[in-house]
Amino acid sequence: MKKLILTFSLSLFVFSLFSQSSKIVFENSEHDFGEIQEKGGKVSYKFSFKNDGDEPLLILSVKPSCGCTTPNWSKNPIKPGEEGFIIAQYNPRGRPGVFRKSLNVVTNQSIQDKPNNIYIYIKGNVLR
């Protein structure tokens, strides 16, 4: 009987661990800069998101697809219901033409709540 109660208690504990998670929800996952001048210098966009889960959300890393994009993000845990940000800065120097770059956002979000890796995008057209 003790084994049955112990097994049942452990099952409830494990289930409760997996039922709690953080959940990142972006207002939009892509930004179009439109036409930008190469001589105009770097351009930036601030992606806003909300933690729709019931546990704190932590952005572990933001990995750009190339060296032309520099990310900055909320470093502190985002409490449930609160908002955070990721800023994507693009350097158009020496890169004329159409572009579309991704940023891989890695969070502490539960793997069950796929995806753990989220992608956001910036795009535009660099004019000389």
Tell what function each PLM region has.
Residues 54-83:
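Surface-exposed binding patches on compact interaction domains or structured appendages
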Residues 45-51, 88, 103-107:
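Buried hydrophobic-core signal for structured, non-transmembrane domains
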Residues 96-127:
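Terminal connector regions
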Residues 19-46, 52, 126-128:
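Beta-sheet-dominated interaction scaffolds and their linkers
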Residues 86-94:
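Short, hydrophobic beta-strand segments
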Residues 52-55, 94:
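Short, acidic/polar linear motifs in exposed loop/turn regions
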Residues 38-39, 80, 95-96:
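Surface-exposed loops/turns
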Residues 1-23:
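Bacterial Sec-dependent N-terminal signal peptides
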